[in-house]
Regions:
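An N-terminal assembly and electron-transfer interface module characteristic of large anaerobic redox
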Residues: 1-162
Length: 162
């Protein structure tokens, strides 16, 4: 049990640096707008056992408004978690995106997601490109997705210009 309370946006990743960047972006957001969506971050490696997945789904996922999971190694890396999160999201109508943990598309993860593919791709690209600006844009876009507006989302900024 990670001991987390429910949040509007939940992001799971095995990359601590990615989670730290999103935590810093959330701190910046809350400075500007303390009433903005809440964020819960967790390292998926802390949810390795089926029971920990079940507890997390019950305590956090079922109450989320958007769930984003980034998995290196695809569904095979975390099959029980993928199945349980997909089931909970379907039952509760929660938008869910399973994203590859690297820069290669993963059709199987996309198929387990219920968020439209363009939205999945945009969220993924914010994380692939990295950096503070893209972390801010990731959270801005996530907030727009849960509020019903996303037409004015800024494109991911390439971390390294070609």
């Amino acid at each position: 049990d990670l001991g987390q309370t429910p949040g509007d946006i939940v992001v799971l990743s095995a990359a601590d640096t990615e989670l730290a960047a999103l935590a810093q972006a959330q701190a910046r957001r809350l400075t500007d707008d303390p009433s903005g969506p809440s964020l819960r971050l967790a390292n998926v490696m802390h949810l390795a056992h089926n029971m920990s997945v079940d507890l997390y789904v019950d305590a956090v996922i079922r109450n989320a408004r958007l769930v984003v999971v980034r998995l290196l190694g695809g569904r095979a890396y975390w099959p029980y978690g993928v199945e349980q999160l997909a089931e909970a999201a379907a039952a509760r109508g929660i938008p869910l995106a399973f994203l590859p943990g690297d820069d290669a598309p993963d059709a199987e993860l996309a198929d387990w997601s219920n968020l439209p593919r363009p939205a999945q791709h945009r969220l993924w690209q914010y994380l692939v490109q990295g950096g503070p600006t893209n972390a801010d844009r990731f959270l801005d876009y996530a907030a727009a997705l849960i509020s019903g507006g996303n037409d004015d989302a800024l494109d991911p900024e390439p971390l390294l210009a070609p």
